């Protein structure tokens, strides 16, 4: 849990609001992400690498300038524009969750 919270705080700029070994919450721009410890290692093995989340942010370009410095530690897809009107980058977290980070292109 500590590694996950540290990733969201250090890399993506979230602020921890609740933190324990079993359950933690981080917040950024009024959005929260909740983390719960897996029921067992077997459950974790089943979901590892099969989870995706989408986080909408403000000022993606300044966040991207920070995040791209972690290329040597995490799998990252560079900032790009999507056909559905979002500017995004993608990053894998320490638990192999794929995180889509985006902002409406028109902002």
Where are these regions (language model features)?
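Short secondary-structure junctions
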Residues: 13-18, 74-76
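Flexible, glycine-rich phosphate/dinucleotide-binding loops
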Residues: 42, 85, 107
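Conserved short beta-strand elements that form part of the metal-binding/catalytic scaffold
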Residues: 15-48, 98-103
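Amphipathic alpha-helical segments
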Residues: 2-15
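N-terminal beta-strand motif that seeds the catalytic metal site of vicinal oxygen chelate
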Residues: 1-5, 51-53, 103-107
